[in-house]
Curated annotation (Swiss-Prot):
Source organism per UniProt: Micranthes punctata
InterPro entries: Maturase_MatK (IPR002866), Maturase_MatK_N (IPR024942)
GO cellular component, one term: chloroplast
Protein name in UniProt: Maturase K
Family to which this protein belongs: Belongs to the intron maturase 2 family. MatK subfamily.
Domain of life: Eukaryota
Length: 353
């Protein structure tokens, strides 16, 4: 447990970063405007006036600077709206989402530069990344027996989504603005597809840059907790009585570990070094494979369902996670059908006289 405490230490250098003032700088929205313009050119969709876009941005920044536009009361829901109903409504929505995405990317870039300066990435040269998909399929796939096909759930509660992002963005003002932005878009049925109980589906053809950041932050949070627990439990395989009691004690502490991760875990555990169980992800789909019997994957299947429900308030059914034997079924992954072919060997015996 002492080694695992190192993952729970907060990264102090990012706690004093204030990103909220950047949201009122014109050059941020100039970058966002160029991104939108390039995307519109590629899609041959120029539905707004380019000449008036800079004026719209300046007016938008001015309105964002006024606190009255960030207050919406129940009695006056149609007045003082932050996002007004006009012909430029869609463009303003895109500008705000793209601007926020640019600001959050700055935070990610600072974290990456800091890691490179401290040479923290060198520590992982002897471990297998969970995103090393092709080495996994080439080297490890042939030695596996059972595989669990998992579709990552993507319908999140708004507050859970904001709380997940706060591990990366320490500026409370920016997160409050994001919360207001998501709730306003949900009420107007513009940016997101609303689901019951104030949840959103992180799937949108528009504003892809912002939703890509939100989706990745959620997946990183999910993987950092789930893989860490898988990694810790896999070291308890001995059949001795001492290790058996250690295993029982560990599973009794799983709930505590999840709570600690959910409140204090600042970074993502990118590496998975378990030799008997393998995890790999591609976009919204992941697989969990094992060399042993299907009982182990069955256990983790039900745990994964409870994990999503308890930590992210995601309703998921165990029937959506399929466990297949590779010798009898093919795995549809990365557009390929992969399977393991058995090589039966003939055994010949001879009676001795």
């Amino acid at each position: 447990m002492e080694e695992s405490q190192g993952y729970l230490e907060l990264n102090k250098f990012l706690q004093n970063d204030f990103l909220y003032p950047l949201l009122f700088q014109e050059y941020i929205y100039a970058v966002a405007h160029d991104h939108i313009l390039n995307r519109c050119i590629l899609s041959d969709n120029l539905s707004y006036d380019n000449k008036s876009s800079s004026l719209i941005v300046k007016r938008l920044i001015t309105r964002m600077s006024q606190p009255n536009h960030l207050i919406i009361s129940d009695n006056d829901s149609n007045q003082n709206q932050f996002l007004x109903h006009n012909k430029n409504f869609d463009y303003q929505n895109q500008m705000i989402s793209e601007g926020f995405a640019v600001v959050v990317e700055i935070q990610f870039s600072l974290r990456l530069v800091f890691s490179l300066e401290r040479k923290e990435i060198v520590k992982s040269h002897n471990l297998r990344s969970i995103h090393s998909i092709f080495p996994f399929l080439e080297d490890n796939f042939l030695h596996l027996n059972y595989v669990s096909d998992i579709l990552i759930x993507h319908s999140l509660h708004l507050e859970i989504l904001v709380q997940t992002l706060r591990y990366w963005v320490k500026d409370a003002s920016s997160l409050h603005l994001l919360r207001f932005f998501l709730y306003e878009y949900q009420n107007r049925n513009s940016l997101i597809t609303p689901t019951p109980k104030k949840s959103i589906s992180i799937v949108s053809k528009r504003n892809q840059r912002l939703f890509l950041i939100l989706y990745n932050s959620y997946v990183c949070e999910y993987e950092s907790i789930f893989i860490f627990i898988c990694n810790q439990s896999s070291h308890l395989r001995s059949i001795s009585s001492g290790t058996l009691f250690e295993r029982i004690y560990f599973y009794g502490k799983i709930k505590h570990l999840v709570e600690v991760f959910y409140t204090d875990f600042p970074t993502v555990l990118w590496l998975f070094k378990v030799p008997f169980m393998h995890y790999v992800r591609y976009q919204g789909k992941s697989i969990l494979a094992s060399k042993g019997a299907p009982l182990l994957l069955n256990k983790w299947k039900y745990y994964l369902v409870n994990f999503w429900q308890c930590n992210f308030y995601l309703w998921s059914q165990s029937g959506r996670i399929h466990i297949n034997q590779l010798s009898k079924n093919s795995l549809n992954f990365l557009g390929y059908l992969s399977s393991v072919r058995l090589n039966p060997s003939a055994v010949r015996s001879q009676m001795l006289e």
